[in-house]
């Protein structure tokens, strides 16, 4: 009996001395040992991580040493190391792993923080960014180029996110997409002297106003040209015929013969336009088709008399949308995609003008009546310049912008000399100021227009820099 007591006491002491032997292995999960982090991180004491890390290199639980991260789908949250690059440890029901979760001995899985598909530079679509990164690491291991992200979403398709800022606020792009098919590029040709060969001499823009091919543009774009060619947005080209011209208003109507219906632009009410409204100008400056500029309406009623333009009785729309050579004749539209003007004139940076759409409506109505009655369009005299009256305030503004601007306060300021015209042949240049013709003083641009209609020879005195130069220009009679 005494021997049995001694044996039981020995076993009890053995169990107390080694509690880990009290339970057989596998009967339960022991709590994970707490990670003890050093008070200060010393990277020099860190063991170098393996070079082959499929999950990428990440910081350890203490945020000190670099270790190999676990792959997507690997276990995490207990004794396991941290998840790899771009992955997070998530326990059941999608809860991110935390210290509380770990104390409760719950295991999780490494899940990619990004769930949307991406397109790689290897032209493959990956389920998420983490899979692409893993593929890139495998590629580099094989001494191949790394795989980089080309776009969000699957390869070969755009990423449409209706909640993105660019989707909500790109109203200008919406307008351009709507109007661009009805905007045309116009190429102008003339025959060389003593030759039948034609050469391109100028270009401009226009927009379609009827499904059967009527196109509105500026008069100065198409006049004095032997041949007018129109190119649609799809690249198709057509010969165009000039149907009607209003030189004073600088509006022309041309037509192409096209099988089928063409896209058209509708005319808005320029009388309802407000200063500060957003506008879009589209055209073909420098033959660059469908070039878009945007701006606001500076004023809706800039008088022709104030500007010294050819139609002194008409108000113009002033805008800071850029209108360049070749943009002329293209539409100026509001955010509803309605034409509220024809791009016609750039004076200087930030100051451009458009012919109001209400004037276009009047021209189209009168043109219809003229063609219905069979009235012929009379010939006109033409020298090939675009000009504006020079006032003291405008002269001061131009002097501030251009130091070599002539020291003059009135006259007709030449904005543009059209190539291969009497003006160019006579020697006129841009920025010249016409101060007299045939001995008569020139105060406004209208003075020049009046003399051109009456005289067959123009002996001009122009101020160029600070010199007065005598130039002779012989107007040409042309079909408008």
UniProtKB/Swiss-Prot annotation:
Residues of the PDZ domain: 365-467
GO CC terms of this entry: collagen-containing extracellular matrix; cytosol; extracellular region; plasma membrane
Changes seen on gene knockout: Mutants mice exhibit reduced retinal capillary density, as compared to wild type animals, in all 3 retinal layers, nerve fiber layer, as well as inner and outer plexiform layers.
Gene3D superfamilies per UniProt: 2.30.42.10, 2.40.10.120, 3.30.60.30, 4.10.40.20
Tissue expression per record: In the brain, mainly expressed in cortical areas both in glial cells and neurons (at protein level). In bones, deposited in the matrix, with higher level in newly formed bone compared to fully calcified bone (at protein level). Also expressed in the tendons (at protein level). In the articular cartilage, detected only in the deepest zone of the joint cartilage. Not detected in the chondrocytes of the growth plate (at protein level). In an experimental arthritis model, at early disease stages, up-regulated in articular chondrocytes in the deep layers of the cartilage (at protein level).
One Pfam family this sequence matches: Trypsin_2
GO MF annotations, alphabetized: growth factor binding; identical protein binding; serine-type endopeptidase activity; serine-type peptidase activity
Summary of the function given for this chain in its UniProt record: Serine protease with a variety of targets, including extracellular matrix proteins such as fibronectin. HTRA1-generated fibronectin fragments further induce synovial cells to up-regulate MMP1 and MMP3 production. May also degrade proteoglycans, such as aggrecan, decorin and fibromodulin. Through cleavage of proteoglycans, may release soluble FGF-glycosaminoglycan complexes that promote the range and intensity of FGF signals in the extracellular space. Regulates the availability of insulin-like growth factors (IGFs) by cleaving IGF-binding proteins.
Annotated domain remarks: The IGFBP N-terminal domain mediates interaction with TSC2 substrate.
The protein's name: Serine protease HTRA1
Species annotation: Mus musculus (Mouse)
Gene: Htra1
């Amino acid at each position: 009996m005494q021997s049995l007591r001694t044996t039981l006491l020995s076993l009890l002491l053995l169990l107390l001395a080694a509690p880990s032997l009290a339970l057989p292995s596998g009967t339960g999960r022991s709590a994970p040992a707490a990670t003890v982090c050093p008070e200060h991180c010393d990277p020099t004491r860190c063991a170098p991580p393996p070079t082959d890390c499929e999950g990428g290199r990440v910081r350890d639980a203490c945020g000190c040493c670099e270790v190999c991260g676990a792959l997507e789908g690997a276990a995490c949250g207990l004794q396991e190391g941290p998840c790899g690059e771009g992955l997070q440890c998530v326990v059941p029901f999608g809860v991110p792993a935390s210290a509380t979760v770990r104390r409760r001995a719950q295991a999780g899985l490494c899940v990619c923080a990004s769930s949307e598909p991406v397109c790689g530079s290897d032209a493959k679509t990956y389920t998420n960014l983490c899979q692409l990164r893993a593929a890139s690491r495998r590629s580099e291991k094989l001494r191949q180029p790394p795989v980089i992200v080309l776009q969000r979403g699957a390869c070969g398709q755009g990423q449409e996110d209706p909640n993105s800022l660019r989707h909500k606020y790109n109203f200008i792009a919406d307008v351009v997409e709507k109007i661009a098919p009805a905007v045309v590029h116009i190429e102008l040709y003339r025959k060389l002297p003593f030759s039948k060969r034609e050469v391109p001499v100028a270009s401009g823009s226009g927009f379609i106003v009827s499904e059967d091919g009527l196109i509105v543009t500026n008069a100065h774009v198409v006049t004095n040209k032997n041949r007018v060619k129109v190119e649609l947005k799809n690249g198709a080209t057509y010969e165009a015929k000039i149907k009607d011209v209003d030189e004073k208003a600088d509006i022309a109507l041309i037509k192409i013969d096209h099988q089928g219906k063409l896209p058209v632009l509708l005319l808005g009410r320029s009388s309802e336009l407000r200063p500060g409204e957003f506008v879009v100008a589209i055209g073909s400056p420098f033959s660059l088709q469908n070039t878009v500029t945007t701006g606001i309406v500076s004023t809706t009623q800039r008088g022709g008399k104030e500007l010294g333009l050819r139609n002194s009785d008409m108000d113009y729309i002033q805008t800071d949308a850029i209108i360049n050579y070749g943009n002329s004749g293209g539409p100026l539209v509001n955010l509803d995609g309605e034409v509220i003007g024809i791009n016609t004139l750039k004076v200087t940076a930030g100051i451009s003008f458009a012919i109001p759409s209400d004037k276009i409506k009047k021209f189209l109505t009168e043109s219809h009546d003229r063609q219905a009655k069979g009235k012929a369009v009379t010939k006109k005299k033409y020298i090939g310049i675009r000009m504006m009256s020079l006032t003291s305030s405008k002269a001061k503004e131009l002097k501030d912008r251009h130091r070599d601007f002539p020291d003059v306060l009135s006259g007709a300021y030449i904005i543009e000399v059209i190539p291969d015209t009497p003006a160019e042949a006579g020697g006129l240049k841009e920025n010249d100021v016409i101060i007299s013709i045939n001995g008569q003083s020139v105060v406004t641009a209208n003075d020049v227009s009046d003399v051109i209609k009456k005289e067959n020879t123009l002996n001009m005195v122009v101020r160029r820099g600070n010199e007065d130069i005598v130039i002779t220009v012989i107007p040409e009679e042309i079909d408008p």
